[in-house]
Amino acid sequence: MTTKETFIIRLRKARTQHLKWVNQIKLLVSGIAVDKSSIPVNPSESPFGIWLYDEAMAFATSNSKNVLKEIDLLHAECFEHYFKIYHTLVSKNSGGFLGGLLGSKKPSASELMLAQKFYAELVESSDALINRMRVFESQMLATCEAKFDELVLAPEEAVDPVRLRAETQPKGNVQRMYRGQPVE
């Protein structure tokens, strides 16, 4: 499989992971018991965020710079809406230390309604994010394979840190220096 094909597959998987995240929040807002720890709170630790910051940003220097900037902003916006939901449903109802031991209180009807309002805003941002992802995918499909090889380090070409360290170590008897002075 080529670098380009692998990247497109990962792009689609990242989009799917984002949709799963939104659906988990939908369950939470609907009042259904959900393991809150399964919903990432940190944008850079979500599966989508990991893909965005670790892989997609390699193309931030090419013609996709503006689209990636929009995707990044929309991703942050989605998490801002989720933080509002989290604060409304989770942190307010955790009950402090004893609440963690005894279980959390159920959110009130007004808290659920407020969370649903925040969820509607989240869905709007998420839809815009998915649309920008489709634009980015179209740009990637139109990008030549050579550009992928240039910008994305293929897994089989990944640098082995041990081998790299061995290659950068001086060979033979080379005088070591510290602050310009020879070291014995």
Predicted regions: what they are:
Residues 1-184:
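N-terminal membrane-sensor/transducer module of prokaryotic signaling receptors
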